[in-house]
Amino acid sequence: MTPTTTPVSNPDALSTGTQDVHTLKGTLQRLAPGTPLRDGLDRIVRGHTGALIVIGDDENVSSICDGGFEFDVSFAATRLRELCKMDGAVILSSDLERIKRANVQLLPSPTWPTQESGTRHRSAERTALHTGVPVIAVSESQNTITLYVEGKSHMLEQPAALLNRANQALGTMERYRDRLDQVNNRLHLAELHSYVTVIDVVSVIQREEMLRRVGEIIDGDVLELGKDAKEIQIQLSELRGDNDRERESIIADYLVTDGIPADEEIHAALEAISHLDDKALLNPANIARVLGLPPTEEALDEPVTPRGYRTLNRIPRVQKFLMDKLIVEFGNLDALLNASVEDLSAVDGVGSLWARHITDGLGRLS
């Protein structure tokens, strides 16, 4: 039997600013170290009392609440700690500004599936699924804090463990960045001198994706650490650089399409690469297949010609629409490198000033 009550499908109605309280990301931001709610949770953990806390007091939540007592007081970490000494759940407002109810028995539909074994955690997971709002369970015996939201469960880690993991990941990311810079420079030289092979392109794409993945892992730790992650965030930004734009540029250069690739085709190729598991990513044939190139070992040494997006991207202030016009007109990077100022300025929308700027930029790069 399927439960008849459905989770909230439009969380925008309960947003605070640009942060949505119904998402894992939005809730983790509000549970970061130093926030009032996290302070209250840490007090509960230290007190070994356990807790069941619902973030939201809409009709879906009210419909499964039984007993307890209603009041409307401002949120305070100490107040939350005292109220959680009682057996029932505590209901908070969606903006976390008010404590609405306490000592409440939650009665979500028992037909919602749960993998939890403890009574408190089973109730928390089912309540989150039933209402669509975030629910927090604090284990009395294990001193752990588990968040249930968006059909997922997430156990909060101590800041020290998160910092240690993030720093280790930064070390890995630094090695990935060094290797990416090496293969990137090699590909750049090959592009300027017309000896690019498929494996040159694949090697760069592989390392760009590896850099993206480890950066995504660190993003999660940064989110959960909150204000404690400022230094890590700075290092992450430096190591990441302009990787997202560079990933789009290399796909735009080498994706096999009729004419210049559309944005949708570029994003579809990047999405396909992101779905490869780590082992599949290391197989050059899989990347070649996404690009529309022959996925054979022999074909990896075949020459390919770039359209010119990567090189034009290295020239300051050249916008994508100008790149498109130039590449439609000249076809590939070799023709662009051999074009004169007059040739470039004759392209519709380019003009003499941009033509001179682009010619000078190409000259400096080569």
Curated annotation (Swiss-Prot):
Binding-site positions, ATP: G88, L106, T119, R120, H121, R122, S123
Top-level EC class: transferase
GO process annotations (BP): DNA repair
Keyword field: ATP-binding, DNA damage, DNA repair, DNA-binding, Magnesium, Nucleotide-binding, Nucleotidyltransferase, Transferase
Xref: Pfam families: DAC, DisA-linker, HHH_2
SUPFAM superfamilies, sorted: RuvA domain 2-like, YojJ-like
Enzyme Commission no: 2.7.7.85
GO molecular-function terms, A-Z: adenylate cyclase activity; ATP binding; diadenylate cyclase activity; DNA binding
Required cofactor names: Mg(2+)
InterPro entries, per database record: DisA, DisA/LigA_HHH, DisA_sf, DNA_integrity_DisA_N_sf, DNA_integrity_scan_DisA_link, DNA_integrity_scan_DisA_N, DNA_integrity_scanning_protein, RuvA_2-like
Taxonomic superkingdom: Bacteria
Subunit (UniProt): Homooctamer.
Family indicated by similarity: Belongs to the DisA family.
UniProt cross-references to NCBIfam families, sorted A to Z: PRK13482.1
HAMAP family (alphabetical): DisA
Record's function text: Participates in a DNA-damage check-point. DisA forms globular foci that rapidly scan along the chromosomes searching for lesions.
Protein name (record): DNA integrity scanning protein DisA
